[in-house]
A protein has these predicted regions:
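Solvent-exposed soluble domains appended to multi-pass membrane proteins
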Residues: 1-214
């Protein structure tokens, strides 16, 4: 993320740059893997990513991992997670349910005027929908963690947005725009007064392309 905020001097992620100054920015915090199925487990269960194995695909193992959702659920929090694509991919839904996420919402549950892309609904519709969901949950007066996985900054990088000729940078800029609008919508709502918002990458991506993961 550090490399793409101003890639080559280009303002690829101006909203993330803005948010850096409004919250706590961890300069040397890096995503734990190169794939979502590994990175999610690292984030939500504190289990280091494996290079050749996806723990998410091993229910007998993953259900016994520590879990942020399970801990919060035990403390009285209502847990929910959302994704604009298919949560059955790489066994995500099974892992989520097994580790304490009580309510999952994904592509099969959603209907928007905008048709889904290759991976699912793009970040524009999902970020707007998610902001509304958080606002509604906040209005109930009960504690909750609500998670969402974005998808537009993923190959094939086809997004309804045109800012940069480079498809990858353009997709990164699109996701940045969507997240920025989501944050602004939350800021303008009563939910913001009692909300902790955490933005984290699920996995790494070398940029520029010549840069190795190491």
């Amino acid at each position: 993320m550090n490399e793409t905020i101003n890639a080559g001097g280009l303002p690829v992620m101006p909203n993330m740059q803005r948010l850096k100054g409004e919250g706590i920015w961890f300069e040397n915090f890096f995503a734990n893997s190169f794939r979502t199925d590994r990175g999610e487990v690292a984030i939500l269960s504190g289990f280091p990513a494996q290079t050749r194995m996806s723990i998410m695909k091993l229910p007998a193992k993953s259900r016994n991992l520590p879990s942020l959702a399970r801990s919060l659920s035990g403390a009285g929090y209502a847990t929910c997670f959302s994704y604009g694509g298919d949560l059955n991919f790489t066994n995500q839904a099974s892992y989520m349910y097994a580790t304490g996420w009580q309510q999952l919402t994904w592509q099969k549950d959603l209907r928007f005027d905008t048709p889904p892309a290759d991976w699912g609904y793009d970040d524009a519709v999902m970020c707007d929908w998610f902001a509304d969901r958080v606002i509604a949950l906040s209005g109930k007066g009960e504690p909750f963690p609500a998670g969402m996985l974005t998808l537009s900054s993923h190959r094939p990088f086809d997004v309804p947005f045109s800012k940069f000729d480079d498809k990858e940078l353009n997709a990164f800029a699109f996701s940045d725009e969507c997240v920025g609008r989501m944050v602004d919508k939350l800021k303008a709502s009563p939910a913001w007064d009692n909300l902790l918002l955490v933005l984290v990458a699920d996995h790494g991506y070398p940029w520029p392309r010549s840069l190795s993961f190491t």
